[in-house]
Amino acid sequence: MKYPMVILLLAFLSSATQAEQYRWDYMDIGVSNDGLGKGMTFTVASHTVSNFFARANLMRNQQKTTTKPISSLYSFYTIGYQYWIIYAEAGVSQYDICWYACMDYSGDLAMLGLAGGSGKLQAKLGTGRLNLMEQQWLIVEADASYSFNDNLGISLGITDLDELGGKVTKLGIRLCW
């Protein structure tokens, strides 16, 4: 996971002088896979005022076992600010897991990263801390999208939830407004 992120970071820095503001007005609908299970993913983000944005992200996962499937839902809701290609966001998170019984945990997270693009290609790379279950987890998020037109595109992303949920790959359709 280290090397693709370094390549993405170098691509950001090499095109920083031509980078445009990241387009935060979008909705991603797709599937996720963490190597053990699969599920649906849903993200919606929107500019609010000036360079501020709000974002909600939900990742559902179901892992098959020999007895009963393990179902989990990870979500976070953030408010952020972008200046040039640098962005910061903070908010709350929720982690629900069900096997024979259900547990839910809530916490907070803060992330810092780079976001931008030019033309039809947009990319984002961020890292931060997730406080959940009385522990701190490293969270890394990288995604890229390609727009076919002003309203429709495709998105590909990786979210690394450390030991909490592993590396989750996401592939989906991006709707923009």
Question: Language-model segments: what does each one mean?
Answer:
Residues 1-24:
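Cleavable N-terminal export/targeting peptides
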Residues 18-64, 176:
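Short glycine/proline- and aromatic-enriched beta-strand/turn motifs that initiate or cap beta-hairpins
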Residues 25, 36-40, 69-75, 82-84, ...:
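Residues that define the transmembrane beta-barrel architecture of outer-membrane proteins
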Residues 27, 50-56, 83-88, 118-125, ...:
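Repeated loop/turn-to-beta-strand initiation elements of outer-membrane beta-barrel proteins
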Residues 31-35, 58-64, 83-85, 92-98, ...:
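Transmembrane beta-strands of outer-membrane beta-barrel pores
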Residues 46-48, 79-83, 114-118, 144-146, ...:
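Residue-level signature of outer-membrane beta-barrel architecture
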Residues 110-159:
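A charged, solvent-exposed segment within the mature domains of Sec-exported extracytoplasmic proteins
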Residues 146, 165-177:
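Outer-membrane beta-barrel "beta-signal"
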